[in-house]
């Protein structure tokens, strides 16, 4: 029973959103994610972006991450976008009404980096210059997030305030946000009933499905903060997460653009593999 409870805690701490961040990864656990977005571009050709991510829990409250991204625009060749190095720290040892986490990320990208890990600043996110020129342009920055979240049993609410500091001329800061509400699957409730559902339910079962909403967008920059929101990108998505096993989960998020410069449609997918003390002890549940 203790092993199962530990697995449930690890799974409950698996973030279901694509842009919003909340829980730290369990201590000594490794979370691997392969994510891909199909975007119906407002300006230019449609494109597909991809990101590979690895998160590791150094302590119960401190997580480090490395991410790399690329993209394929219709009619053009595949291009490498760059690398991200991130870390986030949960400030409180115990649960609070508002659980506070601080996040920092160094970005070493090029002008062809199009994956929407976050949205900040002003204007659209499509590539409007030749790909060959964009790949030669260095884009270095430092992203900071103030993360607040709370769980009411299976219901999670998460908010991220995002600031991106440009580390090269003309410097400056861009701002954004991400907000999510997610209702976890019944097997992740942490209750005796949820644990029974996990051990008894077949691989294909509605009890393994979680669902919610995520909204993310930009808030301007130093000079124009929270003004003319229609000139900034905003998206609303329906989040679906399916717990396949003690190690694997699948996420899908169809999203629509809410402003004149947003891409009209975006389909986000993600496959997650979690390995650590809790999941390795729970492998027998999958057999």
Model-derived features: positions:
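Transmembrane beta-barrel domains of Gram-negative outer membranes and organellar outer membranes
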Residues: 3-287
